[in-house]
UniProtKB/Swiss-Prot annotation:
Protein's name in the database: 2-(3-amino-3-carboxypropyl)histidine synthase subunit 2
Gene Ontology BP terms: protein histidyl modification to diphthamide
Cofactor(s), by name: [4Fe-4S] cluster
Species annotation: Emericella nidulans (strain FGSC A4 / ATCC 38163 / CBS 112.46 / NRRL 194 / M139)
Cellular localisation: Cytoplasm
Gene symbol of the encoding locus: dph2
Pfam family, any one: Diphthamide_syn
Region named Disordered: 416-467
GO cellular component: 2-(3-amino-3-carboxypropyl)histidine synthase complex; cytoplasm
Amino acid sequence: MTTELAAAPVLSTPDDRILEETDPVVPQTNRILSEEELAITYDIERTLKEIRQARYKRIALQFPDEMLPDAPRVFQLLSRGLEARDIVDGGSKANTETEPTDGLVDSASRLDLKDADEWSPKLYILADTSYGTCCVDEVAAEHVDADVVVHYGRSCLSPTARLPVIYVFTHKELPLDPVLKAFKETYPDPETKVILAADVTYSDHIPEVYSRLVQEGYSSLFATALVHDPSSVIPNRTVPDSVKEAPESLGNWQLFHISEPPTALLLTLASRVAAIHIYPTDGPAGTDVKPLPASTAMVLRRRYAILTRLSTVPIFGILVNTLSVKNYLHIVDHVRDKIAAAGKKSYMFVVGKLNAAKVANFSEIGGWVVIGCWESSLVDSKDFWKPVITPFELEVALKGDEERVWTGAWQSDFQSILDQPPPSSNSPGNSQEANEGPEFGDHARDEDEDAMSEPESAPPEFDLRTGRYVSYSRPMRDSAPRVSASQGATAAISAQTGAADGPSAARALARRAKGDLAMVGNTFSPGAEFLRSQRTWTGLGSDFNSAANVEYDDEENDSTLVVQGRKGIARGYTVGDSIDRH
């Protein structure tokens, strides 16, 4: 026998739950660093030296989430260091004023003293980053009008657009004896060509590892150093002189990498070096660690499968995932032009930190292109509903089936795409020869016939993943007929006579007669077409749609007056003034 509820069940979170103890978002470190260890880890002396030399006044400190607990102590160390320097400078300048000097030296010292009084640096700790923690957050730094950003932790080293940066990679301890033992077991032949590299947080150990291996008898080693060049043969690392002269000779070298590298680096080097061995640093101390051979075959095959899936996508979304990397606006324009040249439509989005929930709201988009740093552009997650690719992968996806050849080469830095020379025409003189001679009329007539029969004569496109025929993969090419040579020659005559002759007018009339394409402001919109044909719910506001001249449905009902609906709770509703419950 069931009992009736005296009150409705509680379906919300209690108000006092916020006062209860919850798990911390950032895990606590095992131990608190001493002041000396903190100064070494965060490179306080070098940071103070660079701030004093450049005389920065407003300094922004950017920490990743795992280093935020140390941010107040780092702030105090930097503040005390700058104040102590000011006191020392003031005392030294006061002593020099008592010494006999000539007028020129005395005036110069007074100018220096005036500058020292005006130079009062201020430090700011940036809160949450707008994008990835590996990138410099110039947007947050501009909120405090910063002159420089001190970036802590690992970084992608992408060049910034506006502000100078002081990189502090922090120092991490690394036992060298296990590293040397693992290296000798992996490469027993001392003549093997091996490049030594490490993650940026362990890069300061590379010179010591190199010197000790040379003492062991290894003669064909190269120790990399950090450089700010993501477009390098080895991104952000120096390479041997022989590789600078002939980049393809990098295939004769093997790579020994300390700590787990980012996936973008592995994919980039997979086709450039002979082999990659990774020395893990996340294992327990005191245990024998064996380097693991890197294998990127599965990841590369999955990336290529994504490209074949996107070859027939009609609408692309451009995700701007950075506002700080240099030349990001140029690559946005480049990607937009490439998509438009392929007859497809693109929409641009600025979403901040990328996650699956944000991009899932736009079901019209068939694929996403990320514009970001060379590390964050690679999004290899299965949580996203639609594929997310890089600008390099877009170049491959937009090629035809007969041109798309997957060689295994992969790159994530978009600057290398911008540096590529523009494609040259096969025969530069053809355009001039076509406009001369009596056969120009026949040539123009052939172009007119091609323009009229373009949709019918275009080769069919199939989705290589499903095998289905795709009839709507290039909506912008079909909706915007190209202008033939005869149309350009008779443009003035058509304007004077007001005639609507030519194949373009016939095609435009045929398109309007079909009524299959959604128009917004007399312009074809693939997004509106998707909303009209595939979405079952178009949202509220039919009056607004009519006023904006947006036609989604020819059978759309007119708006009606607002009437009183149901009211009550889930146990029973009443309609209008009726007392009956439903």
